[in-house]
Design a protein with these regions (language model features):
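Start-transfer (signal-anchor) and selected internal transmembrane alpha helices
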Residues: 1-45
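Hydrophobic core segments of transmembrane alpha-helices in multi-pass, intramembrane catalytic enzymes
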Residues: 8-16, 66, 106-111, 133, ...
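Structural signal for the C-terminal ends of transmembrane alpha-helices
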Residues: 17-30, 50-53, 116-122
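Transmembrane-helix signature of polytopic, membrane-embedded enzymes
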Residues: 33-35, 118-136
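Extracytoplasmic loop-helix module adjacent to an early transmembrane segment
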Residues: 35-42, 50-74
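Short hydrophobic/aromatic helix or loop-helix immediately within or flanking a transmembrane segment
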Residues: 60-97
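Transmembrane-helix motifs of polytopic, lipid-linked glycan transferases
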Residues: 105-123
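Membrane-embedded helix bundles of polyisoprenyl
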Residues: 127-146, 150-151
């Protein structure tokens, strides 16, 4: 497993190298590109971020991991502050012994939603725009630290 303190650097180096490669290979910006490589890269990001080690380096993640399985699940609770998030967290905490599947789900929501937005707004340059988004806008910190804010 990759040590938590290296995740940020590996992420930024990976995004930079892929961006340079894609920009160098891309000749015609008006051609509508296929979605295949975008989906594969999105799946890679979901797995890379979702299966990260539980570490204080990732901020809020440790709070969610430490409170895992302490809440009991008695069905959907309409009285919670954040109805969807809190109920999913409680349900998954009662089903899975570890918080990792929850982090994978949150990463999937985060990265798939961004990919869909990039595809809708920029159908001919989806991959480049997706890479620019991933390199900018505090993407890594929202995906790992502000779990609720990142998915929202």
């Amino acid at each position: 497993m990759i040590p938590a303190e290296f995740y940020k650097y590996i992420y930024l180096i990976l995004i930079t190298i892929i961006t340079l490669f894609v920009v160098k290979q891309r000749n015609d910006l008006n051609l509508c590109e296929g979605i295949g490589k975008n989906v594969w890269f999105c799946v890679f990001l979901i797995l890379f971020i979702g299966f990260r080690p539980h570490s204080p380096i990732f901020g809020d993640m440790m709070n969610y991991a430490n409170w895992w399985r302490f809440s009991s699940w008695n069905g959907w609770d309409w009285n919670t502050e954040n109805k969807i998030f809190d109920n999913i967290y409680g349900f998954m905490g009662s089903v899975f012994p570890d918080a990792t599947p929850f982090f994978v789900l949150i990463a999937a929501i985060y990265f798939i939603a961004i990919l869909i937005a990039c595809r809708k707004l920029f159908p001919s340059n989806t991959f480049i725009v997706y890479l620019v988004y991933l390199a900018a806008f505090s993407t890594l910190s929202y995906a790992t630290n502000g779990i609720k804010a990142g998915a929202a």
